[in-house]
Design a protein with these regions (language model features):
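Bacterial Sec-dependent N-terminal signal peptides
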Residues: 1-31
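ATP/nucleoside-binding phosphotransfer catalytic cores, i.e., glycine-rich phosphate-binding loops
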Residues: 281, 285-348
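ATP/NTP phosphate-donor binding region
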Residues: 29-118
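Short Gly/Thr/Asp-enriched flexible loops that form oxyanion-binding sites at enzyme active sites
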Residues: 127-145
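Conserved anion/nucleotide-ligand pocket segment
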Residues: 169-234
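Internal helical hairpin/lid segments
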Residues: 240-296
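Short, acidic/small-residue loops that bind anionic groups at enzyme active sites
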Residues: 140-163, 169-175
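A short helix->loop->beta-strand "cap" motif at the edges of active sites that frequently abuts
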Residues: 118, 144-149, 168, 274-275, ...
Length: 348
């Protein structure tokens, strides 16, 4: 055994010496390689804008549409009024507890819409919960051959993240059941969505706020629902915010929940090299924030990012309120924040 070890050692040394004397670099077999996230380049791939006669698929990758037939009919009417054709996901009205069918059924509807080159946009019917359960079932191979717009917000943030990390733009906007009390789509929401999908430049002027932290920033707009951004941390669907402007909205949370999620984003580096933050609607907060936290929500957020000097815009009309304007995620924007007036301009 001793002599065998001597022979093995001699062979190893001989191989090392040969490798050192070779004019070619030795072949190294990597073990346990850790691939770091790669920052997305400045310009993401933009799916083709819609034109009259194009087809849009309406699917529900998350919550069920129980008693929502009238709302979907209104969604179809809206798209038809833009001279667009509509197809519905085969399983869109299925129910599996709170979901629109099983994970397999919801994934199948979304996959068919991704794969069909004749479908030019996918409009998600609603959020709720369930999108994260189908993320790893989706195959974007055909999507990359024939990119299309994916539209939605709230729980659809998970898919926006996934598409962003593939290098494509998507649209954060109203969904198929986003109707007002009159069972109609508010014009202030429908008009910018139409502009976004047909290629008209989006530019918003927002009333100022004394809580705003003034400044000017340029960068890709990324983000969405805070809970979903927090849920994605540590996964391949988390996003790189370096050099970008982060949009956040939330609904139905207590102050300490919001603080905890923001602190988690901070610890994950979301604010380290961020260019700016746009805060959308923080809606239907549970409890009395002044009684529970002692400060308004704006100050809670400013406290989390106090060591950074980027601009912070509050009260942008996007999120879980009736006024929910379209945002093109992945598009470069110019953000100008003031206490009297602020602007968000998308660069076409």
């Amino acid at each position: 055994m001793f002599f065998k070890r001597i022979i093995y050692f001699a062979l190893i040394m001989a191989l090392v010496n040969v490798g050192c004397k070779s004019t070619k670099s030795p072949i190294v077999v990597p073990v346990n390689i850790i691939v770091e996230p790669v920052a997305i380049s400045e310009n993401l791939i933009r799916p083709p804008y819609l034109k009259q006669g194009d087809t849009v698929a309406i699917v529900s990758p998350a919550g069920n549409l129980n008693n929502k037939v009238a709302e979907i009919e209104q969604a179809i009417k809206l798209l038809n009024s833009w001279n667009l054709n509509v197809v519905l996901g085969e399983n869109i009205f299925n129910q599996n507890n709170e979901f629109a069918g099983t994970d397999e059924e919801r994934a199948a509807d979304f996959q068919k819409a991704l794969d069909n080159p004749n479908i030019k946009a996918i409009w998600c019917a609603r959020g709720g919960y369930g999108t994260v359960r189908i993320l790893d079932k989706l195959d974007y191979t055909k999507f990359t051959e024939h990119p299309k717009w994916v539209i939605g917000y709230s729980d659809i943030t998970a898919i926006h993240n996934q598409i962003h990390n593939l290098g494509y733009e998507s649209i954060h906007a109203i969904m198929g059941i986003s109707l007002d009390i009159y069972c109609e789509f508010p014009m202030e929401n429908a008009a910018p969505l139409k502009d976004a999908v047909f290629g008209k430049q989006l530019a918003y002027t927002i009333e100022g706020s004394v809580e705003n932290r003034p400044g000017i920033a340029n960068g890709q707009l990324v983000g969405g629902n805070l809970t979903l951004l927090h849920t994605m941390l540590g996964s391949k669907t988390s996003i790189d915010t370096s050099g970008k402007i982060l949009f956040i909205e939330e609904v139905g949370e207590q102050a300490y929940h919001i603080d905890r999620m923001l602190q988690s984003l901070k610890r994950a580096g979301y604010f380290e090299n961020c260019k700016g933050i746009v805060i959308g609607s923080i809606s239907k907060m549970r409890g009395d924030i002044l009684e529970d936290w002692g400060k308004p929500i704006e100050q809670l957020i400013l406290d989390v990012v106090k060591e950074y000097d980027f601009p912070v815009l509050f009260n942008f009309p996007a999120g879980h309120e009736e006024d929910n304007r379209a945002l093109i995620l992945g598009r470069t924007v110019e953000l100008t924040v003031g206490n009297n007036e602020s602007t968000l301009v998308f660069k076409n």
